[in-house]
Amino acid sequence: MSFWKNKTLAEMDTQEWESLCDGCGKCCLNKLIDDETEELYYTNAACKLLDPKDGHCVHYVQRFNFVPSCTQVTVDNVAELTWLPDSCAYRRLHLGRELPSWHPLITGSKEAMHIAGMSIKNKVTCETKVKYMEDHIVLWPLKDIE
């Protein structure tokens, strides 16, 4: 059932809400904001809890204990989280867009997402190994395909 087509984000239960996350890992990338222009830049430096091979958080349930600055995406804050990538299901649905063809809820697995290049799989380094974030700015997280 395509619950995301029949319900608003606010109407979804916890299981439905959590299943919207495709697990791409882009939200777990460190981001920089230019002080003068306020432009957002993604880096390939991932949160220390992110598994670079598949994009899942190794301590998802307890992530706030390990990374207090981690942001939980909720129906109440999704509109404010402008740093979420355009490919993010929460952002897409909030903006009235459809889920993309590669989304795991459409395809039944994360493989199509990885093949489409929409995840962090094998593209990141751990933030603890980065000396200068500016040296790790990348454009691929901005990619958004239907």
From Swiss-Prot:
InterPro entries: Puta_zinc/iron-chelating_dom, UCP006173
A Pfam family matched in the record: CxxCxxCC
NCBIfam families in alphabetical order: PRK05170.1-4, PRK05170.1-5, PRK05170.2-5
Family: Belongs to the UPF0260 family.
Protein name: UPF0260 protein Ssed_2516
